[in-house]
Amino acid sequence: MEKIKGAPDGLLRGIEFDMGASGDCSGEIVMPDYYPEIRKVVSVSARALPDSKFVSDKNLEYGGTVSFNVLYIGDDGALSCVSASPEYSFTQTLPAEVPGASVWIDTCAEAPQCRVLAPRKLSLRARLRTRICADSSTPYAFSAASAAGDAADGECAATLEKHCRSVPTVMRCRTSFTGSTSGTVNAGAGAKPVMCDGCVAPHTVTASADRITVKGNIIVHLLALEEDGTYTCSRSAVPFEEEIPADGARDGDISSAWGRAASVGISRTDAGLCADIEYDIDAEWCRPGEVILCDDAYSTEYKTELGRTDAEVISMLCCAAGSVGVSGEIAKSKAGEPQAYVVDTAAVPRIEKAEFSGGRAVFSGAADVKVYIAHSGEVDCEDVSLPFKFEAALSGDAEHADSIPSGECVWSAHAEVTDIRARVDGGKVTVSADLFVSAEAARKTHFEPVCEAVIEDRRPDGGECCIRVCYPRSGESVWEVAKRCGASLSEVERINKVTGDSLCDGSPLIVK
């Protein structure tokens, strides 16, 4: 700790709340007559697309749509895809009243279900899991007051000794943006699109004055029927670059971004198949800093009562992004049958756990992979879960910590599949995938700093003396000795050639 003569102050940046909520989104699809009738549903996928929030007092209203894609075999024997986007809306009571702009919401769709109600009618449902959080910013200052409640006069305040320390903290802000782009995709000249989807994969995120620049690719996934009657899948990278308004951002801020493909449409042009993509991007920027907190105080001439406050301060652990490769196999597969082949593959990654130890943050999860296999006029879906880990270096003092309790950490992570491959090898299917992961974590630490020193009556006069000696307890700090004796810390340090943080071994100290 450091002894600082000036008055400590600053903003105590903490976490106001970090909570979860869940609900369901459901809807029905009634397909037009030009769609083939449903003979067999092959798979259903869902993606949550948040688009609104409103905060009034402690009430939060948020909503959006869920984009469903249902792949099925029609009565014509071919694969078809139908989409729907039912809306969802929820109301949540917040633990505290905060400005609406400071509330962050992340929603994801899980466990999509599909039920056939009629040859051209489907019932859809997905579970929605939402994270709602907000940071707090509370002014902190140290003040001196008299016993009567007035501000202490300058002469009395000058007798105060303050023991302060610098505590790391971080300011976190988030912004959102909706953009669009287009580009050609890899497909045969006569290919007929069956299903398309996409994901956002930023590779460069930089902060500058009041803006965040995000560069990356939209990975377009296309399932198509070729002229020879076989199905092929392809992935194409469509580049994008966006400058997102970010009020308060500065050069050098640590930044990250992730996003969702809201819609992907395929059209045929003279250059081939072209993808038109709309996407949402969330960007976060962090600015590490410090706040000076007063741990203890006393007056060398007056009796002093201390007032303390509860404070929770967050500091940055990590903010990182990168790629991860995963692989696995399906041991017993329909792909082992004669003339069977892999039609398509898809994966939904999820990150379930984070651990912080040895100077590293380890985010663990799994990619739930679906492999579509054509055989004997049918298409079946086979599942495999591929575990993965993403590691990032911790910053600041956490770099040297052996471990950090999970209760002190808050984190978020997002993952997207940028490429996935499946290969038939005998009677099994080997699957590999590339993921893009964006993760950030912060540590919350509880303090009870001194916010007020109330100066009361003058200490009893110890009488005239040339030298005053104090016998400290072994292990007692020089600061504690000076406080107990009502001595000037600077004099104790100067006379004994020690520092306030030094621990005593029981030898006497001259305090005057």
Where in the sequence are the language-model features?
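Primarily a LysM-type cell-wall glycan-binding module
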Residues: 456-494, 499-511
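Membrane-lipid interaction segments
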Residues: 2-464
